[in-house]
Amino acid sequence: MAQTDDRLPQMHATTILMVRKGGRVVIGGDGQVSLGQTIVKGNARKVRRLAKGTVIGGFAGATADAFTLFERLEAKLEQYPGQLTRACVELTKDWRTDRYLRRLEAMMLVADKEVSLLLSGAGDVLEPETGVMAIGSGGNYALSAARALEDGELDAEAIVRRSMKIAAEICVYTNGNLVIETLDAA
C-alpha cells in the first residue's frame, strides 16, 4: 500500500487509458478511489477537459495532487496557448524544482488534436511510439488489451471501453464506472 508518510495510507490506484486512432483521441478512466484496501468512492471523475475543451487529460495517483497538477497545467496552457508540449515541459520543470510541487504523487496523460503525452513526477514528458498509452494500477492490463485491439475494426472509443472493461475485471483497484472524453484529432 502506498503511503504519504508512516501513518496515513494514501488514496491511490486507478486506470487511465489513451487511444489515438482514426482521426480521434480518446481518454478513459475508471471511477474507483481506494484508501488502503477499502473502496471509498466508486464514481470519481479522473478524466476531464482543459483549455476550453481543446485538451483532454486523465490522472492516476493522489487525487488532491492530481487536481493541483491539472490547475497548474491549465495555467501553463493559458501561458502557452495551442502549445501542449511546451506547456507540459514547463509544468514538469516546475514540478521538479518547486519544493511543494515535487512532493506531489501523480501521473497524467494529456492530449490535444495533434499530440499525446505522459507526464510524471520524475520529470518525464513522453510521447508514445504508438497511439496507445496507459497509467495506473490497471494500466498494463488496459494497455495490453488496447494494443491487441488497435489493429482491428474497432474505433478509438470502442477500444478504450473494451480495454477498460478488461482492466476492471483484473485489477482490484479499477472499476467499470468509466468517464470517457474524446477529441477529433488532426
Swiss-Prot record:
Pfam families on file: Proteasome
Catalytic activity of the protein: ATP-dependent cleavage of peptide bonds with broad specificity
A Gene Ontology molecular function term of the record: threonine-type endopeptidase activity
Keyword ATP-binding attached: no
CDD domains: protease_HslV (cd01913)
EC class (word): hydrolase
Active site, renumbered: T14
Binding sites annotated in the UniProt record for Na(+): A168, C171, T174
Localization per record: Cytoplasm
PANTHER family: ATP-DEPENDENT PROTEASE SUBUNIT HSLV (PTHR32194:SF7), METALLOPROTEASE TLDD (PTHR32194)
Protein family: Belongs to the peptidase T1B family. HslV subfamily.
The protein's name: ATP-dependent protease subunit HslV
Gene source species: Methylorubrum extorquens (strain PA1) (Methylobacterium extorquens)
